[in-house]
Amino acid sequence: MIQKHELPILEYDSNSEEVIRPNHGAEQLKLPEKCVYAFLGDAVDDYAFEAEATVAETFETITRNYPVYIVKQDGMEFCLCAAPLGAPAAAQLMDFLISCGCKKIISTGSCGVLTDLAENEFLIPVKALRDEGTSYHYLPASRYIELNKNIRDAIEHTLLVQNIPFQECVTWTTDGFFRETRDMVEYRKSEGCST
């Protein structure tokens, strides 16, 4: 059912009947349930090469093709894929991965910060201030989205067991990198955003 609004970005359709399915052209592809979806550029391809991963499929976009790797390691099989920059492209590729069988997806990468945070420390978002457009096509409009506490707890437990430092944060999602004005950054910081 469509939730209508004067501003199209705030409209939402809860009906999941897509015009084009995410696995269009790859209906027979069955990917592993576990997936690492990394915003790490060429490091993903480098790791896949070193791990002797196989390419299960190549996801084609108008700017770049993204190999979808299958890695076999320590008796486990998982999917590995580089995530594209930008919410629309990243969501499109993630939809494809999910439609082909990925159910447990962990994403990692780097980010900019608004406050003084230590480098080389994992940041675990607890909520996100939604200032981009893509998420509004997946969930009804709201200022924030809270991240699933069970998933967050599992990630934090794993990092604690491995003695890897981390910090929780509130993140600001935006599609306008060069429109992060001084005043807007200060405003977001006053709302508790640190990334």
Positions of the model-derived regions?
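Accessory terminal and edge-of-domain segments that mediate assembly/interaction
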Residues: 1-104, 112-195
